[in-house]
Amino acid sequence: LHGDDVTDWEPDVRAKQGMFLAFQYPQEIPGVTVNNFLQQAVSARRGEDQSVLDTRRRIMGWMQRLEMDAKFAERFLNEGFSGGEKKRAEILQMAMLEPDIAVLDETDSGLDVDALKIVASGVRAVKEDRPEMGVLAITHYRRLLDLLQPDHVHVLVDGKIVASGGMELAQQLETDGYEAFR
């Protein structure tokens, strides 16, 4: 991150320095609303308290872009959320936190076709607003890549990059499987 090895950094330090991680299975945080969570997270990321009104306006704007009901902001974070709602909540967090790099760990896991399209559209919207932001999308399936249209595709086997290329590599992986890369 910015030329530094972040391996030994604590998660909060990574986040404050501009790294965002969307989890495959986001945790529920009972008692903390989406709105309050984002207010605190944005203030922590920027290193100073943020205007509640301005933050709320940004939240509502992004929620609209992500096709989320405004009532969503008052729900407890991830509590009782569907898989698609959890993923959209994470994309909302990514949009609000404005990271330098976003790591999306199997963001497509458990999503139906419609939810996947909304999430991918949200990632693209954040990327359009912040073209300098890097996105590392980790997936086992090509469908997310088809929607995101990444600049580069890398195949990892046993924790090592064994091939790099473009979308043609994703097609080859889908056709031939991981065994072709061992």
Where are these regions (language model features)?
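Conserved H-loop
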Residues: P131-H140
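Hydrophobic anchor residue at the start of the ABC signature
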Residues: E90-I91
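Q-loop/switch helix immediately C-terminal to the Walker
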Residues: L21-Y25, G31-R46, R58
